[in-house]
Amino acid sequence: MWPQVIPGSKSITNRALILAALAAGPSTIHGVLRSRDTDLMADALRSMGVTITEEAPDRYHVEPPAELSSGSIDCGLAGTVMRFVPPVAAFADGPVHFDGDEQARIRPMTSILDALRTLGVRVENNRLPFTVTSDGIPEGGVVEIDASASSQFVSGLLLSAPRFVNGVTVRHIGGRLPSMPHIEMTVAMLREVGIRVDVTPNQWTVHPGEIRGHTWRIEPDLSNATPFLAAAAVTRGTVTVRNWPRDTTQPGDSIRSILEDMGCTVEFISNGATFDLEVTGPAELKGIHLDMSDIGELTPTVAALAALATTESRLTGIAHLRGHETNRLEALTAEINRLGGNCTELDDGLHITPAPLHGGVWHSYADHRMATAGAIIGLVIKDVGVEDIQTTSKTFPGFETLWEEMVG
């Protein structure tokens, strides 16, 4: 049995940083994930005058300024920085310039930038690089967007909405909205700092109000935990993850039911005031038919499991993954098939049929979740080498070390 403490949630860390930057008073964030994505978020807010002090490696003290300032922001390849920070820039006293990695310049941005224009903010360009300029505090109001490419468009507007004079109502008018749990996370965190949010199907109204300074305690990143639990599933071993929350808005929590459906034994183990999650792999790993529209970020982990299962799998509802760090559907299909697998790309997902795999190079495409998917397969299939495993530092610095400790 291999127990492990997983670092804090990227999604919660970056939302807490935004709310702390916009708050009326200081905040403290415990359990901060330190990764490229979260460091980019902290640096983006610092560039607009927010004081973020590292009190410990995983603890920040955040002091918002009297007024946000103009600046230049490096988004890297962090979707949360690209989509959460432009609405914050609407409250700066001058232009805020955004740019990022070359790959980031092709990621969809039009929905949130057009929304800002509707709310009275000036935006130059429709993709990175772009500049956000506001003439005073924007009024806010009702905005209709197509967020079918990413729920981050909705969350980005909601997080800053309390600072708009009239608040903001966001209406989603496109196709099926992916990753609803991430929007639910945003709403829950807004309410935690005293903001009123009304929710109806495909519509969110955030009322204007003062965001309270807050002490945040960040849960472990459950999506980052999934490769380790998958390791138990494919090796018939047992893995324990410490401090798994019993009640959470994180999409990664869905891995519990997924692993059970694929034949694993999944149990909560009481550990004093907290709980650990223990997973034991089955003698025979079964395939799965799964609508993953709400949990798209788990697709690389589940696809790796499916490639090693004894029955076929069908993963659907994930057409939006074509717009992630890489086209994940195309990449997963290419890499599974490169190792002898049988993966077919569907209009909105993947169909994976059992096939004997062999060694080879698994390409990561500079995508952290692609890299961890290759690591899962490499536990079982001899001579699989993951190209650029270091890309996992985007959300999980030290992944390689923990993985090697687990493998022993």
Swiss-Prot record:
This is 3-phosphoshikimate 1-carboxyvinyltransferase. PROSITE patterns: EPSP_SYNTHASE_1, EPSP_SYNTHASE_2. Phosphoenolpyruvate binds at K10, G79, R107, Q152, R328, R369, K394. It is found in: Cytoplasm. GO terms for molecular function: 3-phosphoshikimate 1-carboxyvinyltransferase activity. Pathway: Metabolic intermediate biosynthesis; chorismate biosynthesis; chorismate from D-erythrose 4-phosphate and phosphoenolpyruvate: step 6/7. It comes from Corynebacterium efficiens (strain DSM 44549 / YS-314 / AJ 12310 / JCM 11189 / NBRC 100395). It is an enzyme of class 2 (transferase). The keyword Cytoplasm applies. The active site is at E297 (proton acceptor). Its main location: cytoplasm. The gene is aroA. It catalyses: 3-phosphoshikimate + phosphoenolpyruvate = 5-O-(1-carboxyvinyl)-3-phosphoshikimate + phosphate. Pfam families: EPSP_synthase (PF00275). InterPro entries: Enolpyruvate_Tfrase_dom, Enolpyruvate_Tfrase_sf, EPSP_synthase, EPSP_synthase_CS, RNA3'P_cycl/enolpyr_Trfase_a/b. Catalyzes the transfer of the enolpyruvyl moiety of phosphoenolpyruvate (PEP) to the 5-hydroxyl of shikimate-3-phosphate (S3P) to produce enolpyruvyl shikimate-3-phosphate and inorganic phosphate.
